[in-house]
Amino acid sequence: GLIGSPVATYAAAPVAVAKTVVADEYDPHPQYQYGYDVQDGLTGDSKSQIESRSGDVVQGSYSLVDPDGTRRTVEYTADPINGFNAVVHREPLVAKAVVAAHAPVVHAAPVAKIAHF
């Protein structure tokens, strides 16, 4: 008997694959702009944002109503020289409650005692 059986081997020849390399388009002066505005009277959601880019400079602003009823507006710019800079404005939307004068104290009328026979 045979102790080891012969093993057939096969080596495939390398296949040449042509790859097409497509360079990503590079825009040396990219530009965009967008914005949105949400005013939902049912939920009270109130927010907006606008932003634009021209080359390496991005500028914009966003606005929202904080839980304390103050509108916060942030205006910002960003560029490679100055980095990101923002200015925050806060504007009260709800007038402060006026302290009411004390109402007169009302006393309960005395309870009449009824005699039962």
UniProtKB/Swiss-Prot annotation:
Keywords: Cuticle, Repeat. The keyword Ribonucleoprotein does not apply. GO terms for molecular function: structural constituent of cuticle. GO terms for cellular component: extracellular matrix; extracellular space. Residues 29-95 form the Chitin-binding type R&R domain. Sequence repeats lie at residues 12-15, 108-111. The tetrapeptide (A-A-P-[AV]) repeats found throughout the protein are also present in many proteins constituting the protective envelope of other species. PANTHER family: CCP84AA-RELATED, STRUCTURAL CONTITUENT OF CUTICLE. Component of the cuticle of the larva of Tenebrio molitor. This is Larval cuticle protein A2B. It comes from Tenebrio molitor.
